[in-house]
Amino acid sequence: MAVDTMESVAVVAVPFPAQGHLNQLLHLSLLLASRGLSVHYAAPPPHVRQARARVHGWDPKALGSIEFHDLDVPAYDSPPPDLAAPSPFPNHLMPMFEAFAAAARAPLAALLQRLSATHRRVAVVFDRLNPFAATEAARLGNGEAFGLQCVAISYDLGWLDPGHRLIRDYGLQFLAPDACMSKEFVDFVLRMEEAEQGAPVAGLVMNTCRALEGEFIDVVAAQPSFQGQRFFAVGPLNPLLLDADARTTPGRRHQALEWLDKQPPASVLYVSFGTTSCLHAEQVAELAAAIKGSKQRFIWVLRDADRADIYADASGESRHAKFLSEFTEETRGIGLLITGWAPQLEILAHGATAAFMSHCGWNSTMESLSHGKPVLAWPMHSDQPWDSELLCKYLKAGLLVRPWEKHADIIPAQAIQKVIEEAMLSDSGMAVRQRAKELGEAVRASVADGGNSRKDLDDFIGYITR
């Protein structure tokens, strides 16, 4: 592709302001910029800062290849997560979601108009929770909109047709959205979709690959609601690191990586529940007892869900302060407890890591599978129960810790320990670990020369620069 053709197209990435969404669009932006495209990333100021600070797996200099833009929105409440809430969904983020949806359109429209005047084409890649971006792209004489699928494409099949043959044949269960999300958020999503209904969308870019969801990609592409859209399965968007990369991270290395360097191969359980989930104190105690009882090496990231603005003041010490002190002393030499941000990609790529106990967010699921690590599935909310179904029943690269029907219960230590020991010590666990390793190799092949994801990325770039 000629350089002038590439430079005459502006790509504008418009993420939804939550960590798993910010991260995926920044990875895609970096991929496109590495291919010579002019890429612009537009989000509220604290979320631009958050995305830049937390991205892992790239040379820090790569961020200089992207132009970042602030979408100013009015002040909003940024409370801590409500630990007494009846639902595990992070409803404390709703004031920010509402403020963003109401105010981000105007500064985005102004940015698109400026870029439209100086480029042959403006390709707007928007998180599908931001349908207003498609409407604004359509207002340009030279604009096109492409949705970014930040969840499994199979999740869309469940949303559109929960009784579909493919779901039935594999014994999968799709939960209605209001069973695992708050009513406020479901209403918000439906309201956004209804307001922007009819906005033309040229295609769908998916953070998945045929090695994981090939059957579902074909079935969803044939659904009437996607008629006329081009499908580009370009995942995984996250960088694929090697064990050597995890051992030679440039700059000052995180303590977790230095600790992993000293552990035997495939001996460590990594435990983390993402950025939008909290565990009750009673559940923390049961999980701690299970980890100790299993006598397995571990890295445990214990932190509460993000605030809407992660840079807002958080007063006081951790609510787990007493536990942290005692547990750290009791497990000294066996494991590592982290209360801040952890370099998850590098941890999963490290040869000492054997398995990942996870909330099953799609970001974490893709990162784990692309590095050949099985998942001990503990879904918390949103699409996560579906991801656990996909992992455990369809891909057979996961073991279920907590069935969704018990999501309101405290899971006892004995039940958790049993799954840890199955994953780390048993023949059946070894089979799951081997299956995850095979999937990891297939996922890596998909982004290598000649792979399906590489071809789809080439096709996407070719289409927007045509």
UniProtKB/Swiss-Prot annotation:
Residues binding UDP-alpha-D-glucose: A342, Q344, H359, W362, N363, S364, E367, D383, Q384
Q: Which residues bind an anthocyanidin?
A: H21, N91
- Where does the record place the catalytic residues? H21 (proton acceptor), D127 (charge relay)
Its EC number is: 2.4.1.215
Which CDD domains does the entry mention? GT1_Gtf-like (cd03784)
Looking at the record's lineage, which domain of life comes first?
Answer: Eukaryota
The chemistry this enzyme catalyses reads:
cis-zeatin + UDP-alpha-D-glucose = O-beta-D-glucosyl-cis-zeatin + UDP + H(+)
Q: What does this protein do?
A: Utilizes UDP-glucose as the sugar donor and catalyzes the formation of O-beta-D-glucosyl-cis-zeatin from cis-zeatin. May regulate active versus storage forms of cytokinins and could have an impact on seed growth.
> Under what name is this protein listed?
Putative cis-zeatin O-glucosyltransferase
